[in-house]
């Protein structure tokens, strides 16, 4: 998925794969913000996890529970990379890749946030 950033803290999908769109009950996420597809608490949670990409130029790697819905959840890995319109310009969005496997819920399951590691993209050789 490719997501544009708008100040102060809005993430808007430019493009997303079919599986991600269907996860959120939409045929197409183009132009949708996190507020359009998530509850207010879900939007705040994702925004806080994505903001280091924009504010710090961080590459973010996550592993564990990467999606959570009413009747199933997904475990896997996710990487978020900062994007800029110009080589030394401000970060204007992110590129995300998620690989996961869905598991059906058999009963109440406590949400466990995925583990997250960040490092500066500028440090990558």
Residue ranges and their predicted role:
Residues 116-125:
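Signal-transducing coiled-coil/dimerization helices and immediately adjacent hinge/linker segments
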């Amino acid at each position: 998925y490719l997501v544009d950033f708008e100040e102060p803290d809005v993430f808007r999908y430019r493009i997303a794969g079919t599986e991600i769109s269907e996860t959120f009950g939409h045929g197409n996420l183009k132009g949708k913000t996190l507020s359009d597809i998530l509850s207010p608490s879900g939007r705040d949670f994702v925004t806080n996890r994505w903001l280091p990409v924009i504010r710090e130029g961080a590459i973010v790697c996550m592993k564990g529970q990467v999606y959570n819905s009413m009747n199933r959840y997904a475990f896997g890995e996710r990487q978020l990379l900062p994007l800029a319109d110009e080589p030394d310009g401000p970060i204007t969005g992110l590129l995300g890749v998620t690989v996961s496997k869905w598991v059906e819920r058999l009963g109440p399951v406590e949400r466990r946030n995925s583990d997250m590691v960040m490092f500066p993209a500028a440090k990558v050789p």
